[in-house]
Each structure stands twice: as C-alpha cells, then as structure tokens.
Amino acid sequence: MSTVVHAQDPFGNAVTLQHPTSAAAVAGFVDGFLGYQPGILAILPAAETDHSLIVQTCAAVLWMFSESPAGPPKARWHLARAAAAAGPATERERQFAAAVAHWVAGDIGAALAQHEALAQQHPRDLAAIKLGQYHAFNLGDAPTMLRLALHAVPAAQHVASLHGLLAFGYEQCHRLGQAEAHARYALAMQPAEPWAQHALAHVMLTDGRLAEGAAFLQQASPQWRGLTSFMRGHNSWHLALFQIELGDDAAALRLYDDEVWGLDKSYSQDQVGAVSLLARLELAGVAVGERWDELATHLSCRTADQVQPFLDLQYLYGLARAGLPQADTLLANIQRFAPLAPAAARAAWQRVAVPAAHGLLAHARGMFKPAQADWPAAADALGAALPGLAGIGGSHAQRELFEQLHLDALQRAGRLAAVQNLLQPQANAQPQSLRVRRRLHAVYAGLGLPALAAG
C-alpha cells in the first residue's frame, strides 16, 4: 500500500500525496502558475514517482498548457495513472481533477462550471480560479473571469496574486478604475507581482497614458528576468506596444529580437506574440528585414493544431507573410475543423475564425507579393470577422492587431472615408500616439483635407 502524506498548498488547501517531497513540487506548481515562475516545472519529475491525484492532475495541466495536439494525450496518461493508483484524495482534489478531465476532453463549458463550483466552495484555491480564468479568457468571457476571482475576495483579500487576477478581470470588463486600484493594491503588497504589472499596463494603454505606461514597464522590466518565457516575453511585448505608439520603433524592434522572440521559440504564446509584434512594427512602417522568414520556420509545424482560434489565426498570418504554402494548409484545416469544434467555441471558429483567416491570408499575401494583392478582399473578410472577434479569445490589446490589419487593408483598398471614420476616434482617445497621428495624416492628405492633415 502506498504511503499517504497530508500536506497543504501555499494557500492552505489540503493536498494528499504519496511522498513528502511532493509537497514542494505542488507548492512550486501553485506558486509558479500564479507567479509565472519556472518552479512550475518541478511537478513533472515528482509525477514520475508520486501517483497521487493532485500531483498527476497538476502534471496533466502542465501538458495542456503546451497548447498543442501533443498535450491532451500526455494529460490523459497522467489522469489515467492517478485513476489506476486509486489513492485517497480530498473532495477539492477530485473536483479539480474533474475540471481538468473536462478540459482534456474538450468540454470547456463543463470545465468552467466545475471551476466556478470550486471557487465558491474553496475560495483559497487560487490555482483553480486562475485556471478557470484561463478558460474564460480563451472564450472571450470577461465577466466570468471577474466573477471567478471575486469569489475569492472574502477568503484571500490579502493575497497579492488574487488582486492581479481581479485587476485583469476588471480590465477585460472595461472597468479601468477598479482594475487599476486592484493592480496597485497588489503591487503595494508585492512590487514584482507580474500579472498585476501586466494588468496595469493594459489600463494605461487603454487610457492613452502611453508615456506613463512605457516608463512603468521599463522600470519594472529587470524584475522579469527570472520569470517564464511567456510572462517575460509578454510584458516585454506590452512595453514594445507603448514604444511603437510613441514612435520609438528602434527600441520596439530591439525588444522583439532580445525578449519577445529571443527566449523560447517553440512555445505557442511566444510564437503568436512574435507574429503580433512583427506585424505591428510593419504596420507602423518599420522595415523588419528577413525576420518573417526566420519566424515562419517555427510555425510550419502548427498547421494541424486547431487548439484555439486565436492561436491559429496568428500562425496563419506569420506563414502567409513569409510566403509559405503551409498557410493554405492551415486555412483548409481551420475550415475543416470549424464545424467540428467543441460546442463552447464552435461559433467563434465558424463565424469569426474562418472569415478572419481569409482576410489575414489576403493581407499577408498582399504584403508578400504587392503585385498580386487583393486589398478589398482582405478588408471585406476582416471586416466580417470583427464584430464577433472577442469570441476567439485573447485580450483587447492582442485582438487590436486584427483591427489594425483591417484598417490597413481599407486604406490600401482606397476606402479612405471608412478609415477616417474608424481612425479619428482612435486619435481622440490616444492623443499621445504618434503611430495613429502618422496614419491619420496620410488619410486626410488622401481625402483632400490638407488642413486636417496638418493638425
């Protein structure tokens, strides 16, 4: 009979283990997940010898975070190993395992319902709450992100990472004042809390506080050195966005080379962050050299993924922008998969991802071979996708890439009145944005409004 070891995770939740040393691995998983620390990886070697439900479930989660077709088979193997061991476990551990099993099976709706129940019954299970937020985020369901975190407030109000979760939930719900308050509360407790820094960067970008946001992230950037590649690269991505808006294109390009695409070229989130930043740099008029060719070599293996529409669409743009035929393969796979997608995401795949994929392919191909460009087709397809864009997942800031590409296609198609109608409100909301002013200047010049172009 296996030994039963009773321990607690960092937030006092009981865990049932087979080996005393596994307690540190579970703590590393929880702290690493919430704080984007590489200690999250310690759960994998622990899972080799400890077949307890919580250890195997955490290992399954880690494999699912690969966001690739390789993840679910590995995750199922860990869940099966725990089932075969048939060891004791708490009800909370069983609920968490059930939520992860739903995720592995592709039933995100059932997984989210289980995470909501966990948040209500075990409000200090912040890892389960954050995982629930991850699912809601990928479905474009910001209110559920916020509601999950609010369940924890009475029990965990003095935990910095909870306020990071609250801040991002509020920000995605467009409640910027509350988002900033929670982010600053988290940072007062823990100045290097990366998710709170991230949420505050979102607030400042949306608020048009571009110089302030750039200075804030620049000052915080040394604190990202020990984080996972995603968090280090993603916060650097946010810093680069501020730099592009302010016209510091050279600094943004350096961040692309050194941080955003300089860490882990195999990981999904690092890859789409690189695609997004490189596209934004190019849209801002920056010559990026042969970077698309190099980036696309790491995307060629993604054509059969269909894990999340948000990911597939950016893989497709990167492949097409480099002129690779795999972009056509990925488009065909998106169209084939869309009617078969899990129920919770099927509408987003069919109504948003498919038209967006056509528009992205047309835009990228037009950039690769201008003589063969079909800018009206790119503009029309992207325009058809925009109303439902939130459903593909990603943040407001991340999805803005598709809006920028749509505007660019409209402008290249000569539809300047439509561009003016969309771009002038952006200029009003972002008076510090040199990028927006430059584009608006060209639009007004093309419209024969030189006085407005000079303004």
Protein language model features and the residues they cover:
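Single-residue signature of alpha-solenoid repeat helices
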Residues: 39-40, 75, 111, 145, ...
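Residues in the short coil linking paired helices within alpha-helical repeat scaffolds
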Residues: 35-38, 71, 107, 141, ...
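Internal metal/ion-chelating core segments
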Residues: 149-246
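Helix-coil-helix junctions within alpha-helical repeat/solenoid scaffolds
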Residues: 241-453
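Residue-level signature for tetratricopeptide repeat
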Residues: 31-32, 62, 101-102, 134-135, ...
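Inter-helical turn/loop elements of alpha-helical hairpins
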Residues: 2, 20-23, 28-50, 59-93, ...
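Generic helix N-cap/helix-start motif at coil->alpha-helix transitions
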Residues: 19-25, 51-55, 89-95, 122-129, ...
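Canonical positions in the second alpha-helix
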Residues: 46-47, 81-83, 117-118, 151-152, ...
